[in-house]
Amino acid sequence: MSELIQNVKASFEQVLGYAPSHIIQAPGRVNLIGEHTDYNDGFVLPCAINYQTVVAAAKREDNIVRVVSVDYGNAVDEFDITQAITFQQDKMWANYIRGVVKCLLARGYQFTGADISVSGNVPQGAGLSSSAALEVVIGQTFKVLFNLEISQAEIALNGQQAENEFVGCNCGIMDQMISAEGRENHAMLLDCRSLETEAVSMPEDMAVVIINSNKKRGLVDSEYNTRRQQCEEAARIFGVKALRDVTIEQFNEKVAELDEMVAKRARHVITENDRTVEAAQALRAHDMKRMGELMAESHASMRDDFEITVKEIDTLVEIVKEVIGDQGGVRMTGGGFGGCIVALVPPALVDDVKAEVEAKYQAATGLKESIYVCQAQNGAGLVEVL
């Protein structure tokens, strides 16, 4: 993170002409288990990772917000918080920031303008929530600069609202919540219905290894929407608000009445919810053998029932599983049809995992992977006062 801090400080001074007063960060995240459960009111188990979005900031006495984006060649966006805050077609990055500020104002928070320089190293397009980290770090920045009475959960909800309503992208609450509330060496069990969170301790030093298949994700939006509709149809047939409310026993009693495809989709969600709650218990007990079994079952369910994995992802999972055996776990993570796998790997096996993947994945698929070795990190907060 030190390089990011240097970059935002330098660009702040270079473009805005004076030194910032505060450094703030918010992390990206990876979901350990609980896939496609969020929009079914279910459970997820993500952790924050040591890839962050970092802001250098200072407050202004007037109502102008100026933002410098280091990652877009020091591009600048400027707006007045007393005027209508509008969507920028030609500066997509700026809309996340505008949206967060607009939503904070709509929630009744009072503040003046600010100068902000922002940069991140959360890999974009890998499904590690670079956009949520940006939304959360901006909310955190206004909290810090103006001593706003806003909880971490509300910073997360405000970010989600900005993404849904201002940017116009549908997302659940998981990404913002873990970025805002993560804890070092812990995962977070999140109930997507009540928004209750619970910190779940992880074995000390356990590496969180994320491997991007670099498979271009086609069809992901249309397939995602289809899965969502199938889950809603299943919930309707069971007469419940969401599949969260169906037990596996109830499912088995009624499975014959369901369309075969709808049944497969529903079975994934119902069993995945149970697995996620049990995974939190296994992780807390540092029972990596059981955690590994649950992650393997999750992957098989995504592959066979939810049908969202692809050959490249299955290949990566098999390569990693051979190395870690029952000392850790591995599965696809994210929406599917490409993207990443996540593995919980004992530190002593990290180099072996990397070596095996580098030796076998490209040979099998023709694609070159990207490997990120992470640790579970703290969520958003103040890094330093300058």
Curated annotation (Swiss-Prot):
The record marks R29 as: Transition state stabilizer. It comes from the Bacteria. The active site is at D175. One of its GO terms (cellular component) is cytosol. It catalyses: alpha-D-galactose + ATP = alpha-D-galactose 1-phosphate + ADP + H(+). The keyword Oxidoreductase does not apply. Mg(2+) binds at S131, E163. It is found in: Cytoplasm. Its main location: cytoplasm. Its EC number is 2.7.1.6. InterPro entries: Galactokinase (IPR000705), Galactokinase_bac (IPR022963), Galactokinase_CS (IPR019741), GalKase_N (IPR019539), GHMP_kinase_C_dom (IPR013750), GHMP_kinase_C_sf (IPR036554), GHMP_kinase_N_dom (IPR006204), GHMP_knse_ATP-bd_CS (IPR006203). Pathway: Carbohydrate metabolism; galactose metabolism. One of its GO terms (biological process) is galactose metabolic process. Keywords: ATP-binding, Carbohydrate metabolism, Cytoplasm, Galactose metabolism, Kinase, Magnesium, Metal-binding, Nucleotide-binding, Transferase. Substrate binds at E35, H36, T37, D38, Y224. ATP binds at S69, G125, A126, G127, L128, S129, S130, S131. One of its GO terms (molecular function) is galactokinase activity. It is an enzyme of class 2 (transferase). Catalyzes the transfer of the gamma-phosphate of ATP to D-galactose to form alpha-D-galactose-1-phosphate (Gal-1-P). NCBIfam families: gal_kin (TIGR00131), PRK05101.1 (NF003472), PRK05322.1 (NF003705). This is Galactokinase. It comes from Vibrio parahaemolyticus serotype O3:K6 (strain RIMD 2210633). The gene is galK.
